[in-house]
A protein has these predicted regions:
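Terminal low-complexity "docking" segments
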Residues: 1-173
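Helix-rich, well-folded core regions that mediate interactions or catalysis
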Residues: 176-179
Length: 179
């Protein structure tokens, strides 16, 4: 679906495929390709908070992102802008819930971090909304976002498995400590 433009894409494609297909039985090349591309995109920290407020500042809170997606009562200037922000919310929720589940722990929630349930709800809902943009230039992508919404929890689990595997590899590759 996406073109391979990022140097980490082959690595992430294989890691996602191993996790999603090999461990979870989720055999959907469009989903695995999309998630691999998402990992590449969010490997650049500035992309994690690409939604901007009216003053151009990054929007870092989930509730504020959701408000920014509203074309009637929020900051979205059009339905295309709503789709773009909702797509980002789905991506953000999937990434944070799968790769940084500790961010949803209660002590972090006191600092306005969303719970895992909040991320799942926002991610599923956002991908569903994106899937409803199913005309014209969005017609081909709409079914992918419907599948991402339907399998959101499995996609989170797949990312958590990737995270765990990467952590294991890192510990195996570290040089022995110097005394």
């Amino acid at each position: 679906m996406q073109t391979q433009a990022h140097p980490l894409e082959p690595f992430f494609r294989q890691a996602v495929r191993n996790s999603y297909e090999g461990k979870l039985g989720l055999r959907d090349p469009d989903v695995t390709g999309y998630v691999a591309h998402l990992l590449c995109d969010f490997s650049e920290a500035d992309h994690l908070f690409s939604v901007r407020d009216a003053n151009g500042h990054p929007v870092e809170e989930l509730d504020a992102m959701i408000l920014a997606s509203d074309p009637v009562n929020g900051d979205a200037s059009s339905f295309d802008a709503e789709r773009a922000v909702r797509k980002h919310i789905g991506d953000y929720a999937l990434f944070v819930a799968g790769m940084f589940p500790e961010a949803t722990e209660p002590e972090r929630r006191r600092r306005k971090q969303p719970s895992l349930a909040d991320l799942i709800h926002a991610g599923k809902e956002s991908y569903y909304i994106v899937s409803q943009f199913n005309l014209f230039e969005y017609e081909k992508e709409a079914p992918l976002f419907a599948r991402l919404s339907d399998s959101f929890e499995r996609c989170i689990l797949g990312l958590t498995l990737i995270r765990d595997e990467l952590g294991l590899r890192k510990s195996l590759m570290l040089p022995p400590p110097v005394n």
